Every structure is written in C-alpha cells, then in structure tokens.
C-alpha cells in the first residue's frame, strides 16, 4: 500500500551561520531591522556577500536609528533595488570609516540610489569651488572645514560604493585606472577649494598669482584612497607701487592652503620642492629653473616625471611644465646619473625593516615600488629620443614601453596586471579605516586575510577558500613582479643582439640597448652587448639556458660595484665550464647559487680567477641542511685533506700540484664566503693561516720523503711561523714568514744534518715558489737570525746561542709572534720554550731595548712608506694602520709579558684582550686599537679580493673603492661612507699609538 510521507521543506530564511554572521548580536540586529521574513531572503544573501557582513549589518542598524522615520523608505528600496543594495552593503562591509560617515550624515545614502555616475573633473572642481566661495569667510577659515570635509567624504563614499559594489551584486567593475584617476580629480578639486579658502583668508579679494603643481601619484593621476598629496608651489614676484610682496603673500597663502587641506581633506606635502623642507615654500619660475639647472639631483628629475598643474593659475602652471620637462629627458646624460639611481634603489630597500618586508605591498621585494622604479628608469633612459614615453602614469608608461619595443608586449601586459592587482589590495586596505597603509595583515591573521580577499572580490577556487586563494595569488604576483622586473630591463637587450626566439617582437635598437646598459651601471655598454651576443649565441641547450638566465643574472649584476667586470667574468666562466652539465643547470635551478655568484663576480677580481680552475666551488654556493655549503666542514678537516692529497704522490712536483689544487679550492671557498658576508675577518684570517700551514706541512713531508737516504732521515725539521703566520692572522696577500730549525738524529753529524736540512728547506721554498696561475706561495725567511745573510737552517742549540748572545731588539720583537706550524712538533715546542726566555725575560726587556724599538718605529714611520703613498689610507704602514697597532701591542708585550702571562700570545687581537684585562691601557683605548686593527685588516683583505693582487693602498673615490667597501663587509657599496669610517677609526687609533710610544 502506498503511503504519502509528510512534506519536509527546508526553511527559506537562512540562519545567521549560513549568512556568515558571527556577531552574537546578529539575530537581534536582524530582528531590529525587520529582516526576518521570507521576503528578505534575497536581501539577506546580498548582505552575506559583503566583505564583512557583521560590520555592514551593524552599520545598517546604526543608520536606521539615525534615519528614524526615513528608514522605511530606504528599507523598502533595499528589498527591490539591487544596485542600491550592492553599493550600500559593499561599502559598509569594506569601510568602517565610510560607515561612520554615513551614520553621521544619514541622508547621504541617497547619493547611492538611482543612476549613479562619477562626475567629471570639471564638475568636481565647480562643485568644490562653489562650496569654497559660499562659505562666510568672516567667521574664519575653520568655518569652511565641516561643509567641505563632508562634501569630500560624500564623493569618496560614492566612488567607493561603485568600486566595491560588484562584490555583492552583479554590478559593473570599475577599472583601477578609473578609480585612481577619479581620486586624483577629487584631489585636484579639493586643492582648488583649499586654495580659494586660503586666498580669501589671507588676501581677501586680491588673488596672488600662484600655481599648485601636483607631484607623485596625484600628478600621475593614479592616486590612492588615502595618501599625502605631493605638491610644488610656483609664484610670481610682481612689483606693485614700487613694492615686491607678491611672493611673500603667495607663501602665506600656500601655507594656509596646506593647513586647511590637512584639516578638511588630506595632508599636503611640499617636501619635493627644491632644497626639500629647508627650501622656500614658494619660488618663482625662474628660481625653479635655475635650481634644476644647477643643483637638482637625479631623484628630483625622476620626481618631475609625474608633475602636472593641479590648481591655481593655469598659465603659470603650464609655464612651469614647459620649462622643466625638457630637463627631465636629459637627466640620464648627467655624470652621476648611474650612482644616484643605484643609491635611490638601495635607500628604498633599506627603508623597510626586514621583519615586515614580506608584508609590504609598496616597498617590499616584488612590490609596487619595484614596478614604478623600473618603469621610471626606462622612461628616463629612452624618453630623450622617444616622446611616446612622455607620460606620467605607470600603466600608461608600461603600455608605451611595450609599444616602443623597450619592453616585451606580453611582459608589459603581465606587469600591468600585477601592478593593478597590488594597487587594488592597497586600495582595499586603505579603504577599511581611511588610513594610509601599504601593509598586508599579519601572516597569522586569517580573519583579516578573509576580509581582504572578499573586499578584493576573490572567491574560493575549489582547493582553497578565499583567503587561501589570496595568499597563493600574492606569492604568485610577487614572484612575477620580481621576475618581470629583471625582464623589463634585460630581455629586450638580449633581442637587440640578434636573438628573436624570445617572442618579444622587434626589440630595441643597438643604440637604445647601449643607453639602457649605461643607465644600469655598465661603463662599457658596447662590450657588454658583445658579451651578451656571445652568451646567447651558443647553439642548442646552452644558448637556450643562457637566454632564460641572463635577464635575472644581469639584474643581480647591476647591483654590484662593477657589473662590467662581472659580466666579463661570467662570460669567461661560461666559455670555460658550460660543457660541465651541472654548471648552467645549477644556475638555472638554484637561484641562491646564481645570485651569490653574480655578487662575487661583480665585486672581486681575485675569486673569478680561482673559479676558472676550481669551478666545483660554485656548487658550494648552494644551501645545505645546516646552512651554506661554503661553511660546511671545519678548518682542521680541510687542512688534513690537503696534506693527505699531497701524500699520495712520491714525486714532489705532482704532490705539490695536488696540494695547490686543494689550496685553490680552499682559497676560492674562503674568499667567496668572505665576499658573501658569511665569515667575519677573524675567521677569514684563521682559515687562510690553516691553508698555509697545511701547504707547508704537505711540502715538507713530500720533500723529506723524496730526499731520505737509505740510511734514514738525517735530522728532524720544524717550521716556525713568524709574523702574521705565527699569529694566525694571515691575509689574502700575505707571504709566509718562517724559520727552519733542525736537530740531528742519533748518530748523524751536525754538519751533515744541517746540510741535508738546508737542502730540504731550499727545495720546499723552490717548489712552493714556482710561478703558477694561482696566488703566489712565497716562503720568506728574512726574519731569521742575521737576516738574509744568516744560515737558512740552524740547529736548536745554534738558535739558543745566537739569541742569548747576539739578538738585536728587532729580532727579539720578531720572536713575539714565533709559533710552531709544521714539521716535528716536539722540536717546534722546544724551540718555543727556548724563545720564551728571550721574548719574555725575567724582569722584562731592558730599557735600552725598549728605547731602540721606539727609535726603529720612528724610522719606519718616516722612511718605509712607499713613495707616493697616502699615509692616511695605507692599510699597513699608514696612520693607525696594521703596523701601528701591531708595534704598539708588541711594545707592551716586551715591557709587561714577564708580569702578565696572558701576554704570552702571538695573536695581536688576543694580546690586546690581555692588555685590556690587565688594565695596562685604558679599556677605551684598547677598543680603539682593536677596532682599527679589524678595520685595516678587513680593508687590506678587501683590496686583494677586489684587485686580484696584493696591495696596501686604498683607492680614491670610484668603483674600486665601492667594491672594497662591499668586500670589506661595510654593508653597502658606498665607498665614501666606508672611507670616512676608515679615516675616523685610524685617526683615533693613531692618537693612542702616540700616547703609548711617547710614554
């Protein structure tokens, strides 16, 4: 039998949960509005689509309370009028600030009803001007603030409602350029109204000739919802009745205008004027022209790209544009154009704290400033010869660059899309509270991301909810901007050298390519183009990978002190090693490796030569599980590996060749880690010392093995390190100062043992000193007793006898840094015990010896500095340089080591620590000496890294000094700042040196 089941019908009225209403008061709010019947289902679903439905509902409750009897009219319209519903719910769910405005001015909802359109620029200006003129100025300028502020907020309300309506209902989407242009028109109207009020306040009926030039985003007609409006004022100095006071009056008007606009509309910023905030607020046109011709910096011409008359005297405003814009298009010819552009880019990057960089839409990596900077630079470079680039807005400029072949059309379109997406998010973030911000929500704030996604009309995609889609899109867009940022500059350059497989169109001319490379920091653009042609001209896989790699590599190179040298080095490496299958693949697949390699190549002449013969070190530029691979393994294990590699060969020449191979690799590793900021200077010096010690040990072992007679080894030999080798503080350009000590084995005559040991020592020196393509391995024995005229090798007893009877003060001083480094350890240890009696005698060295040391130091200061050297910047022998610090420390050791055992130390830095701990010198003075030693050592090492050969003299201002600054770990390649710091530090240290040596 068929039984009919009772009908079950799901209620049509959605629950608050299904509507996305989370406020516990939401049910009561709906009841209060009467939105709780089946007639309201469609309205409720519209409400649910608001970016923040709870905020929209609460604002509606407050609005209903304020409307009182007029609420019924709005309530009735909301049931049937979809456009009104979309505009109202969307704007209330997007902007708490505009919700407050609407509640305070409840009748303003009518602005959103009916056929709503955006007024033209002329209509806006007429409306605002009329409002400004209708104010009773006798009551003071403040009387004009409320009506004009309300008018401005009403116009913002209408624009915002139209802008976000499509998030709620099927309303037309306002293009970003339309929104930004209207905001700029609104700002122009507000500036005009503020100028009228200010003029009436200051001058009454008189009208001083004053033009307001919009700059920045307002000037480009791409303004944000909330932004300072950048302006420049131009006045005219008119003589009247023998007096010239128009400019003073105009200045008072300009100041009053800025104050009034700040109270009624937005902050007006005139800091882009000549001389910035220190300059005159209002200048004549002639004064502006004179300033820009003589004093203006590159960034000031870049700012003029956006200049546009916005308010005030239109003829004067246009005259300003006509006079100054031609200068903009010749700015790239200025001598300091490239360094100033690079400095601007660095400043922008430094503005953003590292902990919020990933949240910064504007200034973060892959953000809006990256796009704007790239576009403006390309305009400055090519606008001199192409008037189609004389446009102000970023979007228009991108289109013009694409049309002109300076940027690939697809790249221009993609960059525009990314730019507009990021600007849309910026607009939504500002709209919420009408506050100036460019900061994305905190990563953990899911609710804020959910709101932002809905306000930006981002919907779930089946895999992610709306906020998940937004997060993924942000990553994608940021990566795309970073990638396109490089392509904008360099991809068309590659096509200009004849490779059209990139699908960019016809590309730019060779002349345009040279201009662009010059603007990006290449001093030899023709050579750079030749390198690009060679790199991309390779056939098959190599050429294709180079075409993919080069835009990004060139972008990274442009941030280095010497991109020309870097590109040449990269070409040489590619020519030599591109047949290694891993070489190009690693650069393509591991961005960290490629970026680090470009920094190294564009900074150092020393490292590329090593990489040519040790390319495997490039693979160490990658990151391993525990950090950079360049830092994997310790010094001791690497030293053991070097000695072991040499020990595999009986032939000394082949053994030394094996040792050189590992030394080359190790030098490339240390130097790379140094330039990349992974090692501090103390670690660098210790690592370089460990390499030298291992080479000496390997050479000594193999030579002894090759020269051992059938009767056995005639003598034990130890190598004593002197100078910086003994102190464990070698630099890249340091020789190895050593002494050889021997002791006959049992049954061997001393003369035979010494003769054999001399042969070993001479062969070690000869093998290591053989010329090669690697950095030299000079073994210097000049610090032995009697200097170069003394025996090359002595027995321990001979050393003891000589030092006890004949040692000169300088020889005692030299022993302060003696340390066993290779050979027989027990013999080396006994040598040091013997040396201790000489260098740390009971009661200290004699007063006459101290006096002799002081005399020698004075002679060194006067005579040893090379001819033509600058004593202020010679890192070794100059004022407050290494010699000054080391001699000072050694003098204190000679005087006090018998009292302070901690001074029995061959390291300058460790001895300085002991001097401070023993309070032999004031701690402040010790710190000055320590800082000077570290500064000079960094500089001296950096000189070798940059120039590729040992040198002690800092260069003058220019590329090389900038590179030295970067290689020395200064933090930027600002050579001027680095040099100022060097001079300051060494000057202070020299004062301490004089105090100690004089006392």
Curated annotation (Swiss-Prot):
Example of a GO biological process term: regulation of glutamine family amino acid metabolic process
A Pfam family matched in the record: GlnE
Region (Adenylyl transferase) residue spans: 498-999
Cofactor requirement: Mg(2+)
UniProt keyword list: ATP-binding, Magnesium, Multifunctional enzyme, Nucleotide-binding, Nucleotidyltransferase, Transferase
Cellular compartments per GO CC: cytosol
Coiled coil regions, renumbered to chain: none
Protein's UniProt name: Bifunctional glutamine synthetase adenylyltransferase/adenylyl-removing enzyme
């Amino acid at each position: 039998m068929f039984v009919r089941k009772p009908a079950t019908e799901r209620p049509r009225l959605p629950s608050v949960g299904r509507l996305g209403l989370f406020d516990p008061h939401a049910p009561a709010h709906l009841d209060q509005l009467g939105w709780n019947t089946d007639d309201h289902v469609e309205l409720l679903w519209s409400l649910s689509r608001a970016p923040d439905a709870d905020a929209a509902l609460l604002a509606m409750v407050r609005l209903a309370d304020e409307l009182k009897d007029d609420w019924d009219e709005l309530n009735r319209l909301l049931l049937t009028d979809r456009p009104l519903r979309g505009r109202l719910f969307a704007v209330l769910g997007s902007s708490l600030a505009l919700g407050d405005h609407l509640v305070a001015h409840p009748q303003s909802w009518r602005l959103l009803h009916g056929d709503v359109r955006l007024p033209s620029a002329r209509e806006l200006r007429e409306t605002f001007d009329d409002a400004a003129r209708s104010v009773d100025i006798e009551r003071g300028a403040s009387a004009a603030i409320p009506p004009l502020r309300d008018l401005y907020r009403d116009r913002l309300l209408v624009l915002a409602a139209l802008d976000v309506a499509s998030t709620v209902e099927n309303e037309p989407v306002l293009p970003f350029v339309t929104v930004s242009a209207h905001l700029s028109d609104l700002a122009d109207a507000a500036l005009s109204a503020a100028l009228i009020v200010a003029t009436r306040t200051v001058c009454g009926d008189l009208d001083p000739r004053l033009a307001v030039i919009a700059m920045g985003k307002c000037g480009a007609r791409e303004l944000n919802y909330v932004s300072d409006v950048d302006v420049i004022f131009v006045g005219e100095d008119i003589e009247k009745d023998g007096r010239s006071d128009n400019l003073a009056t105009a200045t008072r008007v300009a100041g009053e205008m800025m104050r009034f606009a700040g109270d009624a509309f937005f902050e007006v910023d005139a800091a882009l004027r000549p001389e910035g905030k220190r300059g005159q607020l209002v200048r004549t046109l002639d004064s502006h022209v004179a300033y820009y011709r003589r004093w203006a910096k590159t960034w000031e011409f870049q700012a003029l790209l956006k200049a546009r008359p916005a308010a005030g005297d239109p003829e004067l405003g246009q005259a300003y544009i006509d006079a100054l814009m031609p200068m903009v298009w010749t700015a790239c010819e200025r001598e300091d154009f490239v360094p100033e552009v690079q400095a601007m880019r660095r400043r922008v990057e430094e503005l953003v704290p590292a902990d919020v960089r990933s949240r910064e839409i504007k200034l973060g990596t892959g953000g809006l400033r990256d796009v704007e900077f790239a576009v403006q630079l390309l305009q400055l470079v090519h606008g001199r010869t192409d008037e189609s680039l004389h446009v102000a807005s970023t979007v228009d400029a991108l289109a013009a660059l694409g049309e002109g072949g300076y940027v690939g059309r697809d790249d221009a379109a993609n960059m525009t899309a990314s730019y507009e997406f990021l600007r849309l998010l910026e607009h939504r973030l500002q709209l919420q509270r009408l506050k100036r911000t460019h900061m994305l929500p905190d990563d953990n704030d899911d609710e804020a991301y959910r709101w932002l996604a809905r306000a930006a009309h981002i919907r779930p995609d089946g895999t992610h909810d709306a906020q998940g889609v937004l997060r993924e899109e942000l990553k994608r867009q940021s990566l795309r901007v970073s990638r396109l940022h490089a392509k904008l500059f360099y991809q068309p350059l590659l096509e200009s050298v004849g490779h059209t497989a990139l699908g960019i169109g016809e590309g730019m001319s060779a002349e345009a390519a040279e201009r662009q490379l010059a603007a990006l920091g290449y001093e030899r653009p023709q050579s750079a183009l030749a390198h690009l042609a060679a790199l991309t001209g390779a056939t098959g896989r190599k050429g294709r990978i180079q075409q993919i790699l080069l835009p990004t590599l060139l972008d990274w190179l442009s941030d280095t002190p010497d991109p020309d040298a870097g590109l040449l080095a990269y070409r040489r490496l590619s020519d030599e090693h591109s047949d290694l299958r891993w070489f190009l693949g690693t650069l393509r697949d591991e961005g960290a490796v490629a970026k680090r390699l470009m920094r190294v190549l564009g900074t150092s002449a020393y490292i590329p030569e090593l990489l040519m013969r040790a390319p495997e070190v490039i693979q160490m530029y990658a990151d391993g599980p525990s950090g950079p691979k360049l830092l994997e393994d310790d010094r001791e294990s690497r030293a053991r590996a070097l000695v072991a590699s040499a020990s595999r060969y009986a032939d000394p020449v082949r053994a030394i060749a094996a040792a050189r191979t590992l030394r080359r690799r190790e030098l490339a590793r240390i130097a790379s880690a140094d330039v990349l900021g992974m090692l501090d200077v103390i670690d660098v010096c210790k690592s370089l010392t460990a390499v030298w010690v291992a080479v000496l040990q390997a050479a000594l072992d193999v030579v002894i093995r090759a020269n051992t007679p059938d009767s056995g080894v005639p003598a034990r030999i130890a190598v004593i390190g002197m100078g910086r080798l003994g102190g464990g503080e070698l630099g890249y350009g340091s020789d190895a100062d050593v002494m050889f000590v021997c002791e006959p084995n049992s049954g061997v005559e001393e003369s035979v043992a010494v003769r054999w040991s001399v042969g070993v020592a001479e062969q070690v020196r000869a093998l290591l000193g053989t010329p090669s393509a690697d950095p030299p391995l000079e073994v210097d024995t000049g610090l032995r007793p009697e200097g170069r005229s003394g025996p090359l090798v002595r027995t321990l007893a001979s050393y003891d006898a000589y030092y006890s009877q004949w040692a000169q003060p300088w020889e005692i001083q030299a022993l302060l840094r003696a340390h066993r480094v290779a050979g027989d350890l027990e013999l080396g240890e006994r040598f040091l015990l013997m040396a201790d009696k000489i260098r740390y005698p009971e009661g200290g060295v004699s007063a006459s010896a101290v006096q002799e040391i002081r005399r020698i130091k004075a002679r060194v200061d006067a005579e040893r500095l090379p001819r033509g050297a600058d004593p202020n910047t010679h890192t070794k022998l100059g004022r407050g340089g290494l010699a000054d610090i080391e001699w000072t420390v050694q003098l204190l050791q000679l005087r006090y080591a018998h009292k302070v055992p901690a001074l029995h130390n061959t390291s300058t830095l460790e001895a300085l620590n002991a001097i401070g701990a023993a309070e032999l010198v004031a701690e402040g003075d010790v710190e000055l000496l320590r800082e000077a030693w570290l500064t000079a050592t960094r500089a001296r090492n950096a000189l070798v890294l940059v120039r590729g050969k040992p040198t002690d003299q800092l260069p003058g201002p220019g590329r090389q000094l900038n590179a030295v600054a970067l290689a020395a770990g200064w933090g930027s390649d600002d050579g001027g700042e680095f040099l100022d710091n060097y001079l300051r530090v060494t000057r202070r240290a020299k004062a301490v040196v004089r105090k100690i040596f004089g006392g």
